[in-house]
Amino acid sequence: MRGAVQVFIMLLLATVSDCAVITGACERDVQCGAGTCCAISLWLRGLRLCTPLGREGEECHPGSHKIPFFRKRQHHTCPCSPSLLCSRFPDGRYRCSQDLKNVNF
């Protein structure tokens, strides 16, 4: 009987609530903290989230390097951290790296 009551309460809560609380949602970079940017979510279409700046080896977009960017960012990745640059690798992908001379291919 107790299990049936718990299931009933769970079903009631699921049908009553039709929204979710998402923390870190943003529209522009200025709404995010230091070391982050407002990037498009990979999972939820139309949602932008405060995302950490790219670390070494992470994918980046070569045209997305300005922080803060005052319009809506059009990429799912943030620019690289200040000490890194967005470099094209032999596989055709762009990644954050320290220096092209020191990259091991």
From Swiss-Prot:
GO biological process: one example: angiogenesis
Entry's Gene Ontology cellular component terms: extracellular region
Signal peptide (from-to): 1-19
Protein family: Belongs to the AVIT (prokineticin) family.
Gene Ontology molecular function: growth factor activity
Higher taxonomy: Eukaryota, Metazoa, Chordata, Craniata, Vertebrata
Gene that specifies this protein: Prok1
UniProt keyword annotation of Secreted present: yes
Major localization class: secreted
Stated name of the protein: Prokineticin-1
